[in-house]
């Protein structure tokens, strides 16, 4: 497996792949000051590869790079200490960290990050390039649009719809639908412009 991006996020993916026994060939990054990461060689070669995982935390940058690279198969990494229902679906390129629970009927899009200790309950639909931060809890039947960021320790009430490119602040409690492009913070979560 090849990783794209020698970031802190890459370190966590390395831990997951090592725990799974998945061989890591090398890491690709354009920063000339990084020659290795956790003992793995970092190269500048953005060539065509058979199988890779995007290891950049920023959803926006992740999407830009994925769209311009020629990778035949985007792998996924699911930590062995994550609990994922056999009746859930996880898209290509998605990374699921330790302590995560993804329940039955949940559909997780492509190139998402479901971070440490987050929970996604039954029948949720999570779009592509979404980041569910550590300790965030998503109740059943929630829909989250592409490119959204659900902040650390936040919680989302059942059957809520969160639009595309939304940022939910750390510790927020989302109890009503959130429109596209909004940043919402607080308990209950409100559009930041309302403060």
Where are these regions (language model features)?
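Structural signal for interior beta-strand "rungs" in well-ordered beta-sheet cores
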Residues: 77-192
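Small/polar loops that bind or transfer phosphate-bearing groups
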Residues: 5, 53-57, 158
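Short glycine-rich anion-binding loops that position phosphate/pyrophosphate groups of nucleotides
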Residues: 9, 57-60, 190
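Short amphipathic alpha-helical segments
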Residues: 14-16, 64-68, 108, 179-180
């Amino acid at each position: 497996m090849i990783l794209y991006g020698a970031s802190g996020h890459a370190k966590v993916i390395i831990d997951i792949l090592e725990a799974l026994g998945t061989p890591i060939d090398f890491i690709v990054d354009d920063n000339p000051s990084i020659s290795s990461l956790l003992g793995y060689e970092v190269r500048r070669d953005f060539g065509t590869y058979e199988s890779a995982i995007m290891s950049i935390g920023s959803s926006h940058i992740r999407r830009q790079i994925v769209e311009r690279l020629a990778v035949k198969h985007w792998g996924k990494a699911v930590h062995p200490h994550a609990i994922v229902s056999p009746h859930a679906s996880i898209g290509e390129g998605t990374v699921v960290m330790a302590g995560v629970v993804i329940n039955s009927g949940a559909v997780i899009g492509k190139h998402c990050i479901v971070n440490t200790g987050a929970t996604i309950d039954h029948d949720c639909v999570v779009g592509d390039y979404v980041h569910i931060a550590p300790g965030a809890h998503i109740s059943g039947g929630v829909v989250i649009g592409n490119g959204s960021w659900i902040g650390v320790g936040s919680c989302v009430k059942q059957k809520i719809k969160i639009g595309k490119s939304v940022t939910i602040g750390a510790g927020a409690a989302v109890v009503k639908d959130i429109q596209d492009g909004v940043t919402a913070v607080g308990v209950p979560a409100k559009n930041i412009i309302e403060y």
